[in-house]
Curated annotation (Swiss-Prot):
GO (cellular component) term, any one: bacterial-type flagellum basal body
Pfam (any one): FliE
Name of the protein this chain belongs to: Flagellar hook-basal body complex protein FliE
Underlying gene: fliE
Organism field: Pseudomonas putida (strain W619)
Family, per entry: Belongs to the FliE family.
HAMAP family in the cross-refs: FliE
Amino acid sequence: MSQGVEFNRLMLDMRAMQADAMSLPKATAAPELAEGQSSFADMLGQAIGKVHQTQQASTQLANAFEIGKSGVDLTDVMIASQKASVSMQALTQVRNKLVQAYQDIMQMPV
């Protein structure tokens, strides 16, 4: 007889858990962006493109200086090189923070 009572209690508990689960708000998809707004992925892509452009400009300026093109100063070459270096370091730090945030989220208990 006690098995019947335990079974009924188990069924009541399961129904209560089901009702609790049904009353929880549903997970929603990412909100739609308003017109004119860009997503984080777009901003990151633009930043990567800008770093690439900075590095290309630095390389072109250095090559022009090496072949002795007139109007190219060593100071301009060094400044362009440092700009490219700093932008790459900043992008690397952003990448490191993204990886760390991803790892933190993945280690969260569910």
